[in-house]
C-alpha cells in the first residue's frame, strides 16, 4: 500500500499531528476554543499590521499624518486600521478568557505550557504598548513617557536604563523609530513562542473540564474540533467587524486625535482598557518603586500558580469554595479595571488600594488555604 503523504512527509506530518490526527479529549467545552482564537487573532494582527506598515512613517513629524493619510487616501486603509486597533482589544479579551479557563480548570499544572503562556502574555503586553505609541497622538506620547519612566525607579541603573531606552533625554524621534522596530519584530517572536507553547501542550495533551485523565476517551481533532473552531472564528469576527465598522473609536482615547505635544499634558493619562487593572495596581501604591514592583507582580504572580495549587483535585468543577473565590477574583479584576479609568481622587484611591490588596490576597493566600480546606472536607 502506498504510504499516506499526510503521515509520512516530514512537514505535513507535523501539521497532521497538531491539527488533524491530534487525539483530543471528547468532552472539552467552548472554553477550549480560545487557543485557536488567539492564533487567528495573531494572524489577523500580523496581516493588517503588515499592510499598515507599508504606509506608515516612523518619524515624529510624519507619524501622525501618515496614519491620517492611511485612513483617508489608502484603499480600505480606514478598515485595515480599525481592524488592527480593535483586533488588539479582541486579542486581549481572548487571552484573558484563555488564562481564566486555565486557572479554573487547573491547566497550569502543565507547568511548561503555563510558563510559556505567561511569557506570551508579557510579550503581547509589550507589543501592544509599543504599538500604541506609533500613531504619535497625545496619549501615545504621554503613555510612552509615563510607562518608560517607571524604569527610572530601579535603583542605581534606573535613569541610565530609561535614557538608553529613549535614545536621548526624552521621548523623541529615536524612541519612535525603535518602538516601530520592536512592534514589527515582537509579533513574529510571539508566533515562535506560540509554536513552543503548542509543542509543550501536545507533549501532555489537553486538559478537560473534569480535570481527569482522558486517555481512554479521545477523538481526532479533525473534523470535530476543526469545525468547532471555525464556529468560534465566526463568533469572534462578527463583533470585531461590527466594532470596526460601526464604532471604531469606542475603546480608544479621544486625546489621541490630537498630535503629540510635549508642552501640553493631557488631564488624565490612562492606558487602553486592557491594561487598566495593572495601572490601578500601579497607582494604588504611593511609592514609585513599590508601585512598579506591584505592577510587575500583578502579572508575574501567574508564574506562582502551579506552586500554590494545594487541592487534590485538578479542576474547580467540583470545588464550590474555590469557585466562589475564583468569581470573586474576576469581580475584583473588573473593579480594578474600572478604578484604573477613573481620576486619582477620594473614593477611587481607597477602592483601588483595597482591590489591589484583595487581588494579591486571593491569589497568594486564599486559594491555597481554600484548596487545603476542601481536601480536609472531602477527607482526602
Curated annotation (Swiss-Prot):
Its main location: mitochondrion. Heme 1 (or BL or b562) is low-potential and absorbs at about 562 nm, and heme 2 (or BH or b566) is high-potential and absorbs at about 566 nm. Keywords: Electron transport, Heme, Iron, Membrane, Metal-binding, Mitochondrion, Mitochondrion inner membrane, Respiratory chain, Transmembrane, Transmembrane helix, Transport, Ubiquinone. GO terms for molecular function: metal ion binding; ubiquinol-cytochrome-c reductase activity. The lineage of its organism: Eukaryota, Metazoa, Chordata, Craniata, Vertebrata. This is Cytochrome b. It comes from Uria lomvia. InterPro entries: Cyt_b/b6_C, Cyt_b/b6_C_sf, Cyt_b/b6_N, Cytb/b6-like_sf, Cytochrome_b, Cytochrome_b_C_euk/bac, Cytochrome_b_N_euk/bac, Di-haem_cyt_TM. A ubiquinone binds at residue 202. Binds 2 heme b groups non-covalently. The chain crosses the membrane at residues 34-54, 78-99, 114-134, 179-199, 227-247, 289-309, 321-341, 348-368. The gene is MT-CYB. PROSITE patterns: CYTB_CTER, CYTB_NTER. It is found in: Mitochondrion inner membrane. One of its GO terms (cellular component) is respiratory chain complex III. The cytochrome bc1 complex contains 11 subunits: 3 respiratory subunits (MT-CYB, CYC1 and UQCRFS1), 2 core proteins (UQCRC1 and UQCRC2) and 6 low-molecular weight proteins (UQCRH/QCR6, UQCRB/QCR7, UQCRQ/QCR8, UQCR10/QCR9, UQCR11/QCR10 and a cleavage product of UQCRFS1). This cytochrome bc1 complex then forms a dimer.
